[in-house]
Amino acid sequence: ELQNHGVARLYSPADGQSLGLQGMIDDMLQRTRDAKCAFKPQIDALTSGDRIQLTRSISSIENNAYSDSELNDLRLLAAKVGTPILGITGTGGAGKSSSTDEIVRRFRQDSLDSLNIAILAIDPTRKKTGGALLGDRIRMNAINHDRIFMRSLATRNASVEIPQRLAEILDAIKLSGFDLIIVETPGIGQGDAGIVPFVDTSLYVMTPEFGAASQLEKIDMLDYADVFAINKFDRKGSEDALRDVSKQVQRNRSAFDRTPDTMPVYGTIASKFNDNGITALYQCLLGELRQHGLKQFDSILLAVEGRVSTQRTLIIPESRQRYLAEIAESVRDYHRQVSEQSRLARERQQLAASKSMLKQAGKTLDGLDELIAKRDSSLDHLAKRLLDTWPQIKEDYSGQEFVVRIRDKEIRTPLKKESLSGTAISRVSLPQYEDHGELLKWLLLENVPGKFPFTAGVFQFKRDSEDPTRMFAGEGDAFRTNKRLKQLSEHSEAKRLSTAFDSVTLYGFDPDPQPDIYGKVGNSGVSIATLDDMKALYDGFDLCDPSTSVSMTINGPAPTILAMFLNAAISQQTQKFIDANGQDPAEEQLADIKAETLRQVRGTVQADILKEDQGQNTCIFSTEFSLKVMGDIQAYFTQHGVRNFYSVSISGYHIAEAGANPISQLAFTLANGFTFVEAYLARGMQVDNFAHNLSFFFSNGMDPEYTVLGRVARRIWSVAMRFRYGANERSQKLKYHIQTSGRSLHAQEMSFNDIRTTLQALIAIYDNCNSLHTNAYDEAITTPTEESVRRAMAIQLIINKEWGLAVNENSNQGSFIIDELTDLVEEAVLKEFERISERGGVLGAMETGYQRGKIQDESMHYEHRKHDGSLPIVGVNTFLNDEPEPEFDLELARSTEAEKQSQLQRLQSFKQRNADKKSEALERLSEAARNDENVFAELMNAVQHCSLGEITDTFFEVGGQYRRNM
């Protein structure tokens, strides 16, 4: 139907089977290879300022559609227009597009959007293919305004840096009534200065990494450019680069009557929001352009003193850049220590046994006591304690009940369950080692569940009253999702709710009649725009009940959504007080209700901005600002004693869904976790004040490594936290949620998906995950239906309640292959830590796109093997059904027109009700961000009067937008 309406081609799973990924790409490119005939506007029509006419004219000029006489008329008309032109060029990867965007932002801010600005971004054409990647637009955040026009062009010739018809294109833009034209040219070599004749003022952008100072003699643009920017000024050697370039410009201009520091050379960090180096550069360019006739306006930006960026913020201090390599070394040191201690324990036992046998045989014992004493003294305190207490541990686990005495209270936990055949199945099985060396190694590397290094699990026993099942829902408006959550949890005493949000909410926008927003409202997730929506979403659930926990899958605008949730919980408990007492609480009582709510509320918010940059795409604010607010959330949690709610769910799930293999998923996720630890420590927090608020979220899958993913994660985390960071036992416990693989769900033979999900759920439960979400079989093509969700939940229930071996809670321990896999995966993760460390840690690796590139490579490897059949997937590339699958009408979960309209009306009602308080709340929020105060503390107030979209727009102004990469 869509193809009949003009969509060229939709590719189906069947196309993927027959064509493969490369085949679909080739088909798409072939269909776009021949340009359609476009309308050629008249030259004089350009003076109307119509942007559509301008874009068509530029295309016509590129395609030589105008006659020589028409082009001559264009030149004559444009000659009467004195629009100044700024040319920006520089080396490839210097940050020209980011610099251009920040300069445009300064023009907009300084002129209060009174200038009409055109941007012409030129990218090089490749000699071999004749194609060009027009990728500059994706880096632009400041162009979304009626007064900004941007057009990307290819050079259409691999041997030049500017298009053949650049002069005519600039003439066409001049006629369209712009006040300023900015031309950005491709990255160039040392001998190119082709842009200079076409512009009035030229800016050359470079980085500090140009080699020896003598290389500067070879750069033509240092002769011809008017202004110079050394971008990425936060890198090592920047000050030296500034000195060398300034001296070179001084020599080139023979300006020996002036000092090098007066040359127009600026140190900038275009990637940093509101960088004062960029502002200084802009103010220099503004002066140059005014000399060439730039429209006058009253500048509002304060003059910047100096020429370089001074607001350098290091999230991870330079002295801690090797943290991942140090963690890898700490884990390996622990293994070496374990090997040494187990050897000593074995030899001590062997010597003691030898002594006993010799004594029984009446032989001499000379020297044995000394050898035994030497090994005994070499055993550390922990090893001795573990061996000494082992008999008592065996006795504790051998009875029918495990008894713990806390003060005067006894807590009894059943240790056996009788099967139908009368067999007593142990809840925790212990090794039968007689050798002290093997026993000590097991205690130091495995141990019973709930004991360091927590390889088998972070808790002694699973809760009898609460399965690790999460009830996942999100569709339509808050009322519909609330109804679904109640349906899912009606048979469970524990309400473990998980919420998905629609893409409008995920990107921090409000519902809007604008078609591209309106169509997404309430689809593939619930629409939440205000505190009213959040209250309706969880209405009827006691958010402070110990058996209720809420997980929210949201990242970019997570701070705002979290503030809404906490306010909803406080409002709920306040209403309970009113209902119980028949009156509103006094101010002191209200403060007590708030404090108690924050202490009791239980759940997690995803809020992992590092994973979003590496594997997904819902980053909306600058990375620096997002990390700052994440730290603010944790500081707020620490200050208010929020101990049962996780401030972040450090997520590998989306990294895996993007294509990473299980080792990369685990390594990247743990590395991100340790990065948060380092960032919070750098803010002055104490590790034991925040580590318990960190949780993890992993994918499961069919690969063998997934069987040990949790054990490896727990062991690495606990060892690093104990020995590298000196954390206490609670901080050493890594708690994680598992969601079965979405990538393993296939549209072909969908009913087989439940089989895959069952196997993945089984290994997750065997590995003692702390909570589990099983995907529905139809999620390959739609949001799950009530029927498919019920089947998905039944998978967990059948394993937990019917599967016999699930009675045992450490069934992975003692398996040779599990032990081998654990060691192999652990070492692979440590090696990945070292590779990331070589790139400057997680943040340094993100700058070069290391994680994203590796994920893409691994995804392609999977797709190729799936297509060629070397990776068998039943029902997809093997065991194919000879009979075509029967056609059936699948229920698609979609929001209704009534729900969309209701959301718009509720949003308007909220805004009208809070119109008199909104401006003040947003201004306080802005001030908190500008003054480096705790933004989340102010956000807790702002969400009471402001919508999600209003807060997002405010954060864009004070924190900057995320700048996307290709």
Where in this protein do the model-derived segments appear?
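Catalytic alpha/beta active-site cores
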Residues: E1, G399-N700, E705-Y706, R724, ...
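ATP-binding Walker
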Residues: T91-A94, C946
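Extreme N-terminal, non-catalytic leader segments
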Residues: L21-P84
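Canonical P-loop GTPase G-domain recognition
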Residues: Q3-R33, I219, D223-Q296
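Nucleotide-state-sensitive switch-loop elements of NTP-binding domains
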Residues: I61-T83, A94, S99, I103-G191, ...
